[in-house]
Amino acid sequence: RQYAFGGGGIMEQVHRVVLSHLDYDGEGKILEVGCGSGALTIRSALTWPKAKVIGVDYWGAVYNYSKALCEKNAASEGVASRCVFQHGDAKQLDFPDESFDVVISNYVYHNVMGADMQKLLLESLRVLKKGGVFALNDDMKPKMYGDMEGFAQKLRDMGYEEVRLVDTAQEAFGS
């Protein structure tokens, strides 16, 4: 497998921090946008044993990840029956509106070439159920994402009830 939760790697800590910020009861469906090797999808399934977790990824030529690798990794962690992996595009998710209780993404959106980041976020929010939880962990540079405080206010104006921007760098990296 191409990841290891117990190896003391930084991504294990990042995943724990991302998931620790979710106010989620563990029921229903989780979507990970840009699942790569499946590590965060699998960590979510391990954290919430009643949840069904779907990981989507483009699996382009840049990284050596694939659907088959994700499925192998999920099987090795004993969660294959609750994890589904499928090819997908973060710019146009192939799910109906309000399909998921939780949508998560970890260090993915900055890799989506030619995307308007705020439109990309709105696409992820489109598949989130009302009252659901969205967590994005990424390099939130203003020149890439624009004014995120303004975007957070736009989301509030659109009816999203709780919108928080949380800097997790200290928790995840200790810096």
Predicted regions and their residues:
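Conserved SAM-binding strand-loop segment of SAM-dependent methyltransferases
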Residues: 79-90
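Class I SAM-dependent methyltransferase Rossmann-like catalytic core
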Residues: 1-17
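Helix-to-beta-strand junctions that scaffold the AdoMet/dcAdoMet cofactor pocket
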Residues: 48, 112-114, 128-130
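A short acidic, Gly/Pro-enriched loop at the edge of an enzyme's catalytic core
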Residues: 91-103
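Conserved beta-strand signature within the Rossmann-like core of class I S-adenosyl-L-methionine
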Residues: 131-138
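Conserved class I S-adenosyl-L-methionine
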Residues: 26-36, 54
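Conserved SAM-binding loop of SAM-dependent methyltransferases across substrates and taxa
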Residues: 37-49
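A short glycine-rich, Lys/Arg-flanked "PGG" loop and its adjoining helix->strand segment in the class I
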Residues: 118-130
